[in-house]
């Protein structure tokens, strides 16, 4: 799952969907390090020690709390502290209860997918495309398991910041026919 949040479409979609400001991307929410993704994909049987080496670039059992690795969209530093947690740093602060719930549910889905993943892959994928962003993110959410009526509100909130259509990858395919029908109706009525 970590490889799915590579500097590719999924990471870009997540950052755009949750509304991460460009000013945060420069310091507090840097994109995932390519070398980390490549190292973790090469590691066929990961252990805590090998994951630590993959994350820090070398085995670091005692790290400085505020080191450079901490300021990534995905922060694994707390795994080696007493917390044993993962931190998603791509969210902006909000007090809207529905947005907070949607963001929390999204994090749970990401964590569940990562936990259940049998393997990881760093293969190149289709690049981020503004025209199909909403559609691509909807498909990503459905693959995470966010399908059905109980996730409808979450999908709506997370896709609100993305351009494009959630139903059509390249925009509506029936537009020419709809335009022709509208012109025909206008000619008859006008």
Specify the residue positions occupied by each region the protein language model found:
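C-terminal accessory/tail domains of diverse enzymes
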Residues: 1-190
């Amino acid at each position: 799952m970590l490889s799915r949040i590579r500097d590719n479409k999924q990471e870009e979609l997540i950052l755009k969907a949750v509304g991460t400001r460009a000013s945060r991307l420069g310091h507090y929410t840097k994109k995932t390090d390519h070398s980390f993704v490549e190292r973790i994909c090469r590691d066929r049987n990961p252990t805590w020690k090998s994951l630590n080496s993959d994350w820090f670039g070398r085995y670091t059992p005692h790290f400085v709390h505020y080191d450079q690795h901490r300021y990534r969209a995905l922060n694994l530093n707390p795994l080696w502290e007493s917390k044993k947690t993962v931190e998603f740093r791509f969210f902006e602060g909000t007090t809207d209860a529905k947005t907070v719930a949607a963001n929390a549910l999204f994090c749970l889905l990401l964590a569940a997918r990562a936990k259940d993943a049998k393997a990881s892959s760093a293969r190149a994928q289709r690049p981020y495309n503004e025209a199909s962003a909403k559609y691509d993110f909807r498909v990503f959410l459905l693959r995470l398991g966010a399908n059905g009526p109980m996730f409808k509100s979450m999908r709506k909130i997370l896709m609100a910041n993305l351009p494009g259509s959630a139903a059509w990858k390249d925009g509506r395919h029936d537009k020419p026919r709809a335009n022709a029908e509208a012109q025909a109706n206008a000619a008859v009525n006008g």
